[in-house]
């Protein structure tokens, strides 16, 4: 399958940088019965992301349709501040292109990082919190994003996001928490940038020999 990679000239050796800020509003998904009774508010928060998009030739991004990569910070309430507290996460992420139609573009995001829960389970002070057994947690985020430029430096952005935090049962209790949110925000371009011209090409063929065998029964 062919993918778009930059034409081989000096103008393509460039990197785009931008900063993105978004507001989150949504729900905490009550995947345990106790959570359904305790949650009494929406999930609210935000995120800030540093965006990098590389156009240098012979990079892995060239064969994946030039995805955006970067580092971000996410913050959210969890529907019951006195029990579940709030969460903060720092993560690297990658945004893959889905389609582009005129000025509108769509991407999907995968993020994985470290999360912090402000009010975990405590035998004396917070026995209702069966979601977080520790302050340190893993963070996983997925999203589908839309973006529309309004000038040379600004773009409007919106997305549907799924966010998860848990400690992987390294410390009990650990039901983990999931939020489903809609986001609205803006992107500001940090450098004046024009996307290079691309030719269709394919990744170089692998010289390694590959053997695949499967066995099934029943």
Describe each model-derived feature in a short phrase.
Residues 15, 40-46, 65, 84-90, ...:
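Residues that define the transmembrane beta-barrel architecture of outer-membrane proteins
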Residues 8-55, 191-218:
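Short glycine/proline- and aromatic-enriched beta-strand/turn motifs that initiate or cap beta-hairpins
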Residues 33-36, 78-81, 126-132, 167-174:
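Extracellular loop and loop/strand-boundary signature of outer-membrane beta-barrel proteins
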């Amino acid at each position: 399958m062919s993918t778009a990679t930059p034409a081989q000239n000096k103008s393509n050796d460039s990197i785009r940088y931008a900063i993105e800020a978004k507001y989150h509003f949504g729900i905490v998904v009550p995947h345990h019965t106790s959570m359904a009774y305790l949650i009494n508010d929406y999930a609210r928060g935000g995120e800030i992301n540093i965006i990098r998009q590389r156009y240098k030739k012979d990079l892995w991004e060239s064969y994946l349709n030039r995805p955006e990569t970067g580092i971000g910070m996410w913050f959210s309430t969890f529907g019951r501040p006195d029990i579940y507290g709030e969460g903060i996460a720092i993560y690297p992420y990658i945004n893959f292109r889905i389609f582009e139609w005129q000025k509108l573009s769509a991407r999907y995001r995968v993020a994985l990082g470290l999360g912090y829960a402000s009010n975990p389970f405590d035998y004396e002070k917070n026995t209702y919190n069966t979601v977080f057994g520790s302050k340190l947690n893993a963070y996983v985020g997925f999203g589908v994003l839309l973006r529309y430029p309004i000038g040379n430096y600004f773009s409007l952005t919106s997305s549907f996001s799924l966010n998860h935090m848990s400690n992987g049962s390294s410390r009990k209790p650990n039901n983990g928490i999931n939020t489903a949110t809609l986001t609205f925000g803006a992107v500001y371009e940090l450098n004046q940038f024009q996307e290079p011209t691309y030719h269709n090409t394919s990744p170089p063929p692998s010289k390694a020999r590959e053997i695949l065998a499967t066995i099934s029964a029943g």
